Amino acid sequence: MSNGGNAGKKSSSYFHFGAGLGSGILSAVLLQPADLLKTRVQQSNHASLFTTIRELSQSPNSIRSFWRGTVPSALRTGFGSAIYFTSLNALRQNVARSNLLRTIGVVEQKSMVHSSSLPKLSNLANLTTGAVARAGAGFILMPMTIIKVRYESNLYAYKSIAGAGRDIFLTEGFRGFFSGFGATAIRDAPYAGLYVLFYEELKKRLSHIVHSSPQVEGLAEKVDLGLSKNMKGSTSASINFGSGVLAAGLATAITNPFDAIKTRIQLQPKKYTNLVMAGKKMVGEEGVKSLFDGLGLRMGRKAVSSALAWTIYEELIRRAEAVLKREKELVV
C-alpha cells in the first residue's frame, strides 16, 4: 500500500516535470523574438523598439537574427518551467494536505466547478508558494539566464553558447554566472507569487461565471479534485488561457522596474554593481521612464508566454491524470 502511494507520487512528479518542460520549451521558441527585442531595448537608453526591429531586419540573415539565443532561452525556460512547476506542485500539495493549514483557512474547503485539477488554496498560500518555487528555480537556472541575456545582446560578440560561458568564467569568475540574482529574485519571486494569486482567482471567478450561465446550468456533477465532468477540455483551456493573459499583464506591470534593473546589471555588471545603485543610477541619468523600458514588450510576451505555458501545462496534467484514473479503475 505504501509502495503504491510512493509510486503515485513519483508518477505525479514526473507528469509535472514533463508537462512543465514541454510547455516551457514551446513557449520559449515561439516567443524568442519578443524576448530578444526586450533585451535590446533595455540595454540602451536611446534605442526604440522600431529602431531595433529595423536594425535586425537589415542584418544579413534577418530571420535568424530574431531567433538569436533560442537554444539557451529554450533550455533555461524549459528546465526552469519543469523545476518550477514540479516544486510548485509539491508545495501546493503539501499545503493542501495540511490539516493545520486547512483549519486556519489557508486551504479552500468549498467545492465548486473549476477549470483546473490543481489544489485550491487561499490567496496568501497561492502568493507564497508561487514566490518560493520561482525563487528556487531561478537560482538553479541563473547561469543559463546570464548566458542567454549576454548572447541575445549586441554588446558581446559571442559566437557560441560555450564561448559565452567560457568568456564569463574567465573574465568574471564563477560569480559572473550569478550577476543580478538579487534583482532577478526580487522581480521573479513577486511576479510568480502575484501571477499565481491573480491566475487562480481569475480561474475561480471565470469558472463560476461559465458554470452559472444558462448554457451550462445543471452540469454541476463533480468528480474528485473539484473538476466538473461536463466542463469540456476546450472550455477549461479557454478559461485558463484568458486567466493567464490577464494575470500576467497585472503581475508584469507591477514588477517591470526590477526587470529593467536586472537586465542592466547582467549586461554591464561593472557599471551597475548592485540593485540599489543600479536603480539610482538609471533614475538619475535617464529618469523614472528607464525603469519601464521594455514594459510593452515584456507585458505582451509575458501575457502570451505565461498563458501559453500554464494552459499547456494544465492540459497535459489533466489528460495524464485522466489516463491514470482510468488505469486505476481498470485495475480495481
From Swiss-Prot:
Solcar repeats lie at residues 11-94, 121-205, 235-319. GO terms for cellular component: mitochondrial inner membrane. One of its GO terms (molecular function) is glycine transmembrane transporter activity. The keyword Transmembrane applies. The chain crosses the membrane at residues 17-42, 69-95, 127-152, 180-203, 239-265, 294-312. Keywords: Membrane, Mitochondrion, Mitochondrion inner membrane, Repeat, Transmembrane, Transmembrane helix, Transport. It comes from the Eukaryota. Its main location: mitochondrion. InterPro entries: Hem25/SLC25A38 (IPR030847), Mitochondrial_sb/sol_carrier (IPR018108), Mt_carrier_dom_sf (IPR023395). The keyword Repeat applies. It is a multi-pass membrane protein. Coiled coil: none annotated. GO terms for biological process: glycine import into mitochondrion; heme biosynthetic process. It is found in: Mitochondrion inner membrane. Gene3D superfamilies: Mitochondrial carrier domain. It catalyses: glycine(in) = glycine(out). Belongs to the mitochondrial carrier (TC 2.A.29) family. SLC25A38 subfamily. Mitochondrial glycine transporter that imports glycine into the mitochondrial matrix. Plays an important role in providing glycine for the first enzymatic step in heme biosynthesis, the condensation of glycine with succinyl-CoA to produce 5-aminolevulinate (ALA) in the mitochondrial matrix. PANTHER family: MITOCHONDRIAL GLYCINE TRANSPORTER. This is Mitochondrial glycine transporter. It comes from Botryotinia fuckeliana (strain B05.10).
